[in-house]
Amino acid sequence: MISYNDTIAAIATAMSDSGIGIIRISGDDAISIADKIFKSKNHDKKLINVKSHTVHYGYINDDDKFLDEVIVIVMKAPHSYTTENTIEINCHGGVLMVNRILETVIKHGARLAEPGEFTKRAFLNGRIDLSKAEAVIDIIHSKNEFALQAGTAQLKGSVSNEVIDMREQILYEIAFIESALDDPEHISLDGFKERISNTAEHLVARISKLIDSSQNGKILKEGINTVILGKPNAGKSSLMNILVGEEKAIVTSIAGTTRDILEENIKLHGIGLNVIDTAGIRETEDIVEKIGVEKALKYAEKADLVIFVVDSSVPLNESDFAIMDFMKTKKSIILLNKADLITVVSEETLKKYLAQYVGQSAENIPIIKTSTKENIGIDIFEEQIKEMFFNGEISFSDQIYITNMRHKEALEDAKKSLLMVQKSIEDDMPEDFLSIDLMSAYASLGTIIGEEVGEDLVNEIFSKFCMGK
C-alpha cells in the first residue's frame, strides 16, 4: 500500500540528451533531503532557512563527491503544485547525469514516485479537482492547437465551474425538500413543485448542451478520422501528399499504385486530421490490391469524414456509384478533381447521381473543383472541413467542450435523474421521490470533479500519467 505522507522524487523532464534535466522532490522531507546533497556557493546557506519560491545556485554532492553544477528552486508548503514542500533541481541534461542525481535523492530518503503521483497529491490535497487533474494529462498528450486549448480551458476550470454551479442549484432544492419534510409546520411545500420542475428543466438544457459538445470535443482532442476514397488514379495520393506537405504516397499515372493503407496525422488550421489514403475502389483480381480495397471500406465505416475524390477527366462508373451509396450516413466532401484537364464529369452530372444514390442528404454534400496536380481548390477544401464540423468557428470563450468520455457518461446519468424528477412531478409522486432523484443527479455530477468517486477510479486515472508529473 502506497503512503501519500512520505517524500517522493522523479525526473520531470524527457529522458533524452537535452540541455537541462529537472528532478522534482515533494513531501515533508523534500527540503531536508535537498540540504543533505546541495551545497550553495555560500557554503553556510541551508535551504530550510531560505524563503519560499527562491532560486539558488550551487552543486550536488554525493558523500562529498561532486556530481553536477545546479540551480535549485525551493517552494514551501502549501504554495506548491502538490501543496507540499517541493524542490526542483535543474541540472545538466543527459540520461546518465539526471539518473545519478535522482539515485542520490532516493539514497537520502525519498521514494521513487509513481506515474502521475505529483498531480495525484495535488488532487488528494485539495489543490485541484479531478477534472482539472485529467486536463493536465490532456495537455501533455495534445496533438494539435485546439486540443491544447481545450485542455488548458478545462485546467482553468471551464468544466469544474459549470458542474459546481449546477450542483449548487440541485443542493438548494434538496435542502428545501428535506427541511420541509422535517418541519412541515413552519416550511410550506405549496407551489414548490413548479419551481423544482423549472430548475430541472433548466439544468437538463444545460447538461444537454454539454453532452452535445462532446462530439466536437472528441474531435478537438483526438482529431477527425478522415478517409480518402475514390477509384484508382483519381488523385487520392496526390491529395494526401499536399495535406502532409511531402511525398508520402507514390504518385504515378498507373492505376492501382496505392494497394494498402497510408496513415498520417495532419494539423489543419489547428484541427487534427487522422488521414487515411486508401487503395482505389474497383473490382480487381489482384489479391494484394483486393485486400487493400476491403481495408479501405472497413476504415471508411469508422470514419468521421469521407473525402470522395472524383476523376472528372473520365466518365463515372460503378466504383463511383458504390462510394456514393456508402456516403448516405457519413459526413462527406467531394473533390471534383483534375480541373486542369478537359473534364467529362460536370458538377451538375455529379449532383444528379448523388441525388439518386444518396437521397435528400445529397444537398448537404459540398462539391469542390480541384486539381491536386496544380494545387487548385485545396484552400477552399480545407476551410470547408472547419465549416462542416465547427460552423467555421472554434471558440473557447463562450463554449465548453466535453472531451472526456467519463465526463459525458456522468452528465448523461445526471440528465436521466433530472428527467425522472420532472416525470415524478408530472405523476404527482411523493416528495421523497424528488429528493432521491435530485441526490442521484448531484452525485453523478460530483464524479466529474472527484467528489463521488472510489479509489480504484482515481488510481486508474492517474496511472495514465507519465513519471514526474
Q: Language-model segments: what does each one mean?
A:
Residues 56-67, 72-76, 256-284, 302-305:
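Switch I (G2) and immediately adjacent beta-strands of P-loop GTPase domains
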Residues 111, 272-274, 366:
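Conserved beta-strand segments of alpha/beta enzyme cores
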Residues 275, 309, 335:
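Generic enzyme active-site microenvironment
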Residues 60, 197, 306-317:
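Glycine-rich phosphate-binding loop used to anchor ATP phosphates in small-molecule kinases
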Residues 93, 243, 278, 310-313, ...:
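Glycine-rich, N-terminal phosphate-binding loop of Rossmann-like dinucleotide-binding domains
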Residues 2-11, 15-18, 145-267, 284, ...:
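C-terminal-of-GTPase-core extension/linker across diverse P-loop GTPases
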Residues 289-313:
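Inter-motif core of Ras-like GTPase G domains
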Residues 1-149, 153, 157, 333:
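A glycine-rich (often HGG/GG-containing) alpha/beta subdomain
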